[in-house]
Amino acid sequence: MWPLSHRHLCLAFLLVCVLSAISFFLHIHQDSFRHGLGLSVLCPDRRLVTHPVAIFCLPGTPMSPNTSSPCPQHPASLSGTWTIYPDGRFGNQMGQYATLLALAQLNGRRAFILPAMHTALAPVFRITLPVLAPEVDSLTPWRELRLHDWMSEEYADLGDPFLKLSGFPCSWTFFHHLREQIRSEFTLHDHLREEAQRVLRRLHLGRSGDRPRTFVGVHVRRGDYLQVMPQRWKGVVGNSAYLREAMDWFRARHEAPVFVVTSNGMEWCRENIDASKGDVVFAGDGQEASPWKDFALLTQCNHTIMTIGTFGFWAAYLAGGDTVYLANFTLPDSEFLKIFKPEAAFLPEWVGINADLSPLWTLAEP
């Protein structure tokens, strides 16, 4: 055999290097796609916009309780189709939207909303979940699951690829780990936010004429609850004594607050809320068919006083700050407590003031 020349040895070495590089690239390429990553991950293009619902964390991934998920993945990691039946009023559908988004991400599924929910929420918020076409809805082999109003362990491991949720979930235990993402989904459209801020900028304290330093949104739920709570649930709504105590709580802790009152019973509020101190403004229009003006006003305040109901919950959740709520508003034997857990409904840092249940005891007397 003829000995190899120096030139031949160099060429052979270069060939081995080229083949090794090609083999290494192919290995990385195949391994990346085996784990669900596309070329956009290997060579990220900042012009590509990934839908928020694509964020999904594997079980056990640590998550900050007040930020969005820290571990976004490519949308290809999601599969199936999940939606939720839109039911109830404005606050109910906000709870359904947030719960669908959170559970779908937790289970690695794609979330879609139905047209009725889009109609209710899209005029108010910059929601991003896509809408499921009616013809797709009717042809999809759904499994249906009715949720109760608190997060349960089984909801973290739902294997159904085509799932239609229902119920009235409105508990922070479903979605609080995604708080910033939820707040982003429920960002007001500019014209609503600006209109609410214009209203607040015009407010002055009655006695001094000074500008308020603290805005406290007050939502007083009345309407159908006046009958539903005592007759069906052995419960009460917030009365004037509760509202006075809640306002005094803020007066003792915040300088120069103004209380911005909204309600679906504004006439009752004007007659029963003491405005003699000059720090109460009856700002709500009370229009139940178009609640977004009142809602926008509440979310632009610094703090919240709520009575009962999902409308007040969401106003407080989005406003941030301090929240005072009506606590223990049913009798201990109320059937309502089978579907409602106070510890799952109100954030731990919120402040509860016990309701006056004496009207219920009077009704119970023979």
Curated annotation (Swiss-Prot):
Q: Note the topology in the membrane.
A: Single-pass type II membrane protein
UniProt keyword annotations, A-Z: Glycoprotein, Glycosyltransferase, Golgi apparatus, Lipid metabolism, Membrane, Signal-anchor, Transferase, Transmembrane, Transmembrane helix
Can you provide one Gene Ontology molecular function annotated for this UniProt record?
Answer: alpha-(1,2)-fucosyltransferase activity
Q: Which residues lie on this side of the membrane: Cytoplasmic?
A: 1-8
Q: Report the locations given in the UniProt record.
A: Golgi apparatus, Golgi stack membrane
Which sequence ranges are marked TM in the entry? 9-25
Topology check: give the Lumenal ranges: 26-366
Pathway assignment = Protein modification; protein glycosylation
Q: What is its main location?
A: Golgi
Which reactions appear under catalytic activity for this entry?
A: a beta-D-galactosyl-(1->4)-N-acetyl-beta-D-glucosaminyl derivative + GDP-beta-L-fucose = an alpha-L-Fuc-(1->2)-beta-D-Gal-(1->4)-beta-D-GlcNAc derivative + GDP + H(+); a ganglioside GA1 + GDP-beta-L-fucose = a ganglioside Fuc-GA1 + GDP + H(+); a beta-D-Gal-(1->3)-beta-D-GlcNAc-(1->3)-beta-D-Gal-(1->4)-beta-D-Glc-(1<->1')-Cer(d18:1(4E)) + GDP-beta-L-fucose = alpha-L-fucosyl-(1->2)- beta-D-galactosyl-(1->3)-N-acetyl-beta-D-glucosaminyl-(1->3)-beta-D-galactosyl-(1->4)-beta-D-glucosyl-(1<->1')-N-acylsphing-4-enine + GDP + H(+); a neolactoside nLc4Cer(d18:1(4E)) + GDP-beta-L-fucose = a neolactoside IV(2)-alpha-Fuc-nLc4Cer(d18:1(4E)) + GDP + H(+)
Q: Which residues are glycosylated?
A: N66, N302, N328
Q: What biological-process GO terms show up in the record?
A: carbohydrate metabolic process; fucosylation; lipid metabolic process; olfactory bulb development; positive regulation of cell-matrix adhesion; positive regulation of endothelial cell migration; positive regulation of endothelial cell-matrix adhesion via fibronectin; positive regulation of sprouting angiogenesis
User: Would you indicate the residue range of the signal peptide?
Assistant: none
* Family from the record: Belongs to the glycosyltransferase 11 family.
User: What is the name attached to this protein's record?
Assistant: Galactoside alpha-(1,2)-fucosyltransferase 1
